[in-house]
Amino acid sequence: MSELLDHVASCRLPTEWGVFTMHGFEEANGQEHVALTVGNCSDGNPVLTRIHSECLTGDALFSRKCDCGPQLEAAMRAVQAEGRGIIVYLRQEGRGIGLINKIRAYHLQEQGMDTVEANLALGLPVDARDFRLAQSIYEYLGIRSVKLLTNNPEKIQTLKDAGINVVERIPLHVGENLENERYLQTKADKLGHLMSE
């Protein structure tokens, strides 16, 4: 399919928010990723989309330390309401550092570090994700133009650099609470996330 990913399977996926088609993709190293689609996404019109990085703690365990779970739910609801769209779910836990390192970083955050300081203290990158994987998925699905649900300007730039036309950025401000207030502020202050619109 592309130099980054191969499409390996698709199936129907009924969820709390409606029925999606789930597409499975695999990197050469065996790492798996999925995309959830609704409707005809390859008709040339801009497609509502979210690039979501795996977050076991937020997506599956309902942690209040981040806004990931509420963002995923809001994106799934928005795509269903639109009647067409795609959610790219990249298996890049903990901004790409992995689950165990994320737990280590959480421990350092409990001692007063913010999310960026904790990653650096562990000798890890602040953000190790590769959003080019999303471009490979869009390519397979025939998507060239998107309306992107994101607060992260890096996702926008990566898609533009890959030749995807980002016609609109749609802010995704959900899941704020007292437990993740500092985390969200750090994302704005140190990672450039667009949190105030």
UniProtKB/Swiss-Prot annotation:
EC number assigned by the record: 3.5.4.25
Cofactor binding: number and manner: Binds 1 zinc ion per subunit.
Pfam families documented for this protein: GTP_cyclohydro2 (PF00925)
Residues annotated for Zn(2+) binding in this entry: C55, C66, C68
Binding site for GTP: R50, I51, H52, S53, E54, Q71, E93, G94, R95, T115, T150, K155
Superkingdom of the source species: Bacteria
Required cofactor(s): Zn(2+)
GO molecular function: GTP binding; GTP cyclohydrolase II activity; zinc ion binding
Active site residues of this protein: D127 (proton acceptor), R129 (nucleophile)
Pathway assigned in UniProt: Cofactor biosynthesis; riboflavin biosynthesis; 5-amino-6-(D-ribitylamino)uracil from GTP: step 1/4
GO biological process: riboflavin biosynthetic process
Any one GO cellular component localisation term in the record: cytosol
Catalytic reaction(s) noted: GTP + 4 H2O = 2,5-diamino-6-hydroxy-4-(5-phosphoribosylamino)-pyrimidine + formate + 2 phosphate + 3 H(+)
InterPro entries, per the entry: GTP_cyclohydro_II (IPR032677), RibA (IPR000926), RibA-like_sf (IPR036144)
Keywords, in A-Z order: GTP-binding, Hydrolase, Metal-binding, Nucleotide-binding, Riboflavin biosynthesis, Zinc
EC primary class: hydrolase
Cross-referenced PANTHER family: 3,4-DIHYDROXY-2-BUTANONE 4-PHOSPHATE SYNTHASE (PTHR21327:SF18), GTP CYCLOHYDROLASE II-RELATED (PTHR21327)
Assigned protein family: Belongs to the GTP cyclohydrolase II family.
Function statement: Catalyzes the conversion of GTP to 2,5-diamino-6-ribosylamino-4(3H)-pyrimidinone 5'-phosphate (DARP), formate and pyrophosphate.
Protein name: GTP cyclohydrolase-2
Protein species of origin: Neisseria gonorrhoeae (strain ATCC 700825 / FA 1090)
Gene encoding the protein: ribA
